[in-house]
Design a protein with these regions (language model features):
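ATP-binding N-terminal substructure of ATP-dependent carboxylate-amine bond-forming enzymes
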Residues: 1-104, 123
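Active-site nucleotide/adenylate-binding loops and adjacent lid/helix of ATP-dependent enzymes
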Residues: 95-154
């Protein structure tokens, strides 16, 4: 039986539990806190910023994935040194750390996207809002937002 390690014990990791069971996959979760949403499958509680802890976790699984984009790529690079497959790759994860970089990368690949733009300053605000279809529209922080945090409907 393959063992998948998930870094992050949030909602997405929690949703992976029944899917893993149905597929016959053993799931281990590296959670940040005891009471995380994925507590049912949590096998390690610790700091995913600690490369030594992540490397130790990586030795017990066949592949590592993550339940959010905030895992630093350096940490995953260290885990990969243990010989564990990281999927998606740390390089792919890098594209998700900044929504502007992600959108630009998707555009270069020809991936369909909703209308979007970057408000650089107060003066560009009206032009960008007009270009994306006017009000109401969604404004997002390029870095650090998730689960509605850093998101505003205007």
């Amino acid at each position: 039986m393959k063992t998948v390690g998930v870094i992050g014990g949030g909602q997405l990791a929690r949703m992976m539990i029944p899917a893993a069971i149905n597929l016959g996959i053993h799931l281990k979760v590296f959670a940040e806190a005891e009471g995380s949403p994925a507590a049912l499958a949590t096998t390690h509680v610790g700091n995913y910023l600690n490369t030594h802890e992540v490397r130790d976790f990586a030795r017990d699984v066949d592949v590592i994935t993550f339940d959010h984009e905030h895992v630093p790529t350096q940490v995953l690079e260290e885990a990969r040194k243990s010989g564990t497959l990281i999927a998606p790759s740390p390089e792919a994860l890098t594209l998700t750390h900044n929504k502007i970089v992600m959108r630009q990368s998707l555009a270069k690949m020809g991936v369909p996207q909703p209308l979007w733009g970057v408000v650089e300053d107060v003066d560009s605000r009206e032009e960008v809002i007009s270009r994306v279809g006017g009000f109401p529209c969604v404004a997002k922080k390029p870095v650090g937002g998730y689960d509605g945090k850093g998101v505003r409907i205007i």
